[in-house]
Amino acid sequence: MNELLKKSAAEQSKALKNKEVSAVELTNAAFERISELDDKLGAFNSLTKDTALETAKKVDEKIAKGEDLPLLAGIPLALKDNMNLIGSKTTASSKILENFVSPFNATVTEKLLGNLVPILGKANLDEFAMGSSNENSAFKKVHNPWDLKKVPGGSSGGSAASVSSCEVTLALGSDTGGSIRLPASFCGIVGMKPTYGRVSRYGLIAFASSLDQIGPFARTVEDAANLLEVISGHDPKDSTSLNLPVEHYAAHLNDDIKGLQVGVIKELMTEGLSDDVAAAMKKAIEDYKKLGAEVVEISLPNLKHSIGIYYILATAECSSNLARFDGVKYGYRTPDAKNLMEMYTKTRAEGFGPEVKRRIMLGTYALSSGYYDAYYKKAQQMRALVTQDFVEAFKKVDILISPTCPNTAFELGAKSSDPLQMYLTDIATISANLAGIPGMSVPAGFDKDGMPIGLQILAPQLQESRLFNAAHKFERANDYYLQLAKI
């Protein structure tokens, strides 16, 4: 492996500007790494070599002319395969979209290409972003770079594994209930979900529109901050996009956090926590105290309801959003239907995987006449209570911390026959999506088997700069982020 691939995006940018390496060389080195690793890792559904090298050549031309480079120009990136890139397959890891070629770019893709960021390929995911282990892909499972027998987390497992294994330096994922933060935790990297509306969802294949948010993966907090800056901003094509100026998130990374009020979420520090994760949390609390922060315990009384709320609201929205995949306009169509109704039924039965079908049925039930008030409406009311818990908590503290997950990565197949156990993996992450607040997972140590542990940090809406500052100070107080998977 080219040693430069192990470096951060900030270090790679410096090497490009100093002409120590060309963007084409860096991109080709990343493709070589992918060809070495990906048969056993399974992180990519497809590669976009021509697009990536074309972008890299533009970077080299700018350098040759002595022109300034846009932020992150020339840095290899993977795009989760539920975001559109014109002319490439966008499958959402589903048979129903197996041969769908995108006719337009997602807004985040446009922003990346505008900043000359080479997009090397489309990263594997749980089908339609539904899952916590990346075992639900219709094509292949993703393996954890730290131990190939274990899951990388989901649903953005391919994005996380590609960054963790140094196939690419950066990646984009989407987070509906923890789908960026959980794989970041399991793969020992940084993963961040912005405030809802901070990043445009235009061109993202929808799962649950009121919860979905695109965010960055990186190996350092600084790189994640810069990637969020590139993809943020108002988009008239997305009605939920916030009309706010883009911040320079990396500007406050090194601000002193003396006196920062840190709240430890009481409900996420009790039963179910593995001994290794509990020890890592204790160490993280001590680290913040040494940095001058004041640490207190905070209770979020309605947090215990968050999984129930989420699996009513998310499945209801999924049932509605996925109705468009019916075999009429695009995607897979069953070859042997005798009439229109049979074509709908067979196409969806053959095209969707078991987890997607389970969620469509759950959501359709929650929205059906007679159950709407009992389930969907009540879940919306409870969502407001969870959000209010955060509002009250942030009156007392500046940030909240918890484990990203009560446990480290589990073995492939260990939970696939028990959906409820799989759903509980997201116990710590779901509430941030319900409340629309920004959250991040940063490396916080390793368990007895050498598997990464993640610390989750949450901040009030639109306080991404505070989040990055608190995360960066913790990151630099340790060397966890410097340790790479030995794959």
For each predicted feature, which ranges?
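Gly/Ser-rich catalytic/binding loops embedded in alpha/beta enzyme cores
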Residues: 2-176, 283-286, 290-291, 387
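Serine-dependent amide/ester hydrolase catalytic core
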Residues: 13-14, 124, 303, 326-434, ...
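Short alpha-helical scaffolding segments that buttress acidic/His motifs in well-ordered protein cores
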Residues: 26-30, 309-310, 356-364
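Residue-level signal for inorganic ion chemistry
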Residues: 30, 52, 105, 224, ...
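Structural helix-boundary/capping segments
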Residues: 36, 165-171, 176-271, 278, ...
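Flexible, acidic loop-helix segments that line cofactor/substrate-binding pockets
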Residues: 42, 238-246, 260-261, 265-267, ...
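Short helix-loop capping/hinge segments that flank enzyme active sites or metal/cofactor-binding pockets
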Residues: 72-92, 251, 256-265, 316-387, ...
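General small-molecule cofactor/ligand-binding pocket signal
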Residues: 120, 294-299, 440
